[in-house]
Amino acid sequence: MPIHSSRPTRLARHAMIAAILLSSTSPMPAVAGGVTGQATEWTQLANNTELISLVGKSAEQVNNQITQISQLAEQIQNQLNIYRNMLQNTAQLPNHIWGQVENDLKNLQNVVNEGQGVAFSMGNVEDVMKQRFQSFAEMKSNLPDGASFSTTYQNWSGTNRDTIAGTLKAANLTSEQFSSEESTMSSLRSMSESSDGQMKALQVGHQIAAQQVAQMQKLRGLVSQQMTMMGTWYQSEQAQKDLAQARREQFFSGTEHDIRGGQTMEPRW
């Protein structure tokens, strides 16, 4: 999927961040940095108006995270290529260099996990929005065959996992060998004992890093489409009615909530 070329409107970006905040009420995997980690700080914000009042504070958060993941994958890809060239000119990489290889491959694992975490979170966005707003639930996506974003993110994740598994299988390796930090280190220690093992690890890592760069481009395109759809919904007449109703409900409830270190947030309309 190509990267969406048009820049989202300010309202579209705002709607996306509101959706991310809404998704914080659903379970999410722990992902370092990024959207899922920050969203968990707002799990107390069950009121729709409070959630919307935080819109715009982190408008580019999702795209920035995807960019960072993609850049790290590309850096790892380039570094592993350097190690491959070094290995071609020597019998075996010395221990201190192999230690750097192990660190890069562990970082590559984190790249995969963070990408999966973003897809999981953004899939939750649509589900939660449909639960909160009937007008959003009635909107049709602009995806092929009218597929939901939630299902499309699941398909993206499944394809990513299958591609990695296929790459490992081609090298007579399995996903189970790299399913945890402990098993990964054990596998890498075993592969480090020979020049052939080192080269195999470098080639597989290089392939997976290249795949992640391509997968992040697809994920960015999917997020861009979702932002566009949410911007369209946010600007619709029915959405404004839904949000106005949420404001009235909060006004008559007369309640306030402390947010993030005691700072009181009030909706601004």
UniProtKB/Swiss-Prot annotation:
Keyword Ligase carried by entry: no
Annotated signal sequence range: 1-32
Gene: trbJ
Key words of the record: Conjugation, Plasmid, Signal
Protein name, entry field: Conjugal transfer protein TrbJ
Organism listed in the record: Rhizobium radiobacter
Superkingdom in the source lineage: Bacteria
